[in-house]
Structures are given as structure tokens and as C-alpha cells.
Amino acid sequence: MSIISYGQNLEKLIKENIAKRTDTLVHFKTDSPYNYMPVTILSGKEKGPVFTIIAGIHGFEYPPITAVQELIKEIDPKKLKGTLIVVPIANVGSFYKRTPFVNPSDHKNLNNAFPGSETGTITEQIANYITKQIIPQSDVFLDIHGGDANEDLLPFRAMSLS
């Protein structure tokens, strides 16, 4: 597993890996014990589009987190054209502390923190990293949710046509 720090350019890591899986941790500048975000990059044998999937914006939404972890196991980079970036748990603090909606370190909802701030709280830094480092690298960006502990959700989808 490699480790990259906040502000390191993800683009370089994406371009360096061909037909390879890279598991990395992005670290943020904070005193929070959960000051990191796991990222898996599956780079295909051939160049192609970059597809990003993020789960765990709300760390208590377990089904999407489990789904992307299973997906990572199923993908063979040698059979992939392009790159798949997966963030299985964007809000690590919320996941480990089992707190619905907010990060326990700063009590902020990551879903409402975008575009974030490089010098802000842990939640704002995570949002900023996703906004500045991950989204610009992505041809397709999918943020999946599953409903927190006290929610019942009806299936739906939303898509921007721009």
C-alpha cells in the first residue's frame, strides 16, 4: 500500500500504473485520528476513460461501502480498458464511530461540505480533495448512497446532462 498526502497530485499516480491495482491512503492535515481516506486505483491494460465511484460519504451507509469493496475484488486490471478509481469509505471517522450523517471530529456533513477547503476541518479537507484531485481526473463520477441508520429510501437516480 502506498501513502500519499493531502495535496499530492493523484493524476501522476493514475498515469504511472498500467494493468495494476494500487491501494493508497490520502492523509489530511488534522489532529483527527481518522485523518485519512482509502483510495483504490485499478489501471487497465489499455488507456481509456476514468470512472470514479465514491461510497461512504455518510459512513453509516454500509450497503454501498460493502458493494464497492466487493467490486474491487472482482475487477481484473488486465481486462480493464481505462481506469477505475474507487473510494470505498470517504468519511472514515463516521464509519468507525458509527455516526449517521456527520463526521464525529467536526460534526459536519460531508455531503454538504463541497467544494470544501484545503485548510478547513477534516470534512472540508476531504470535500476539497475530492473536488480538486478526484473529480477533475474523472470522465464519469458516481457517488453512491444507501440511506443512514434511520432512513428508508425509495430507489432513485439523478444525472447531470452537462
Q: Which residue ranges define each predicted feature?
A:
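Structured catalytic-domain cores with a bias toward divalent-metal coordination
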Residues: 3-162
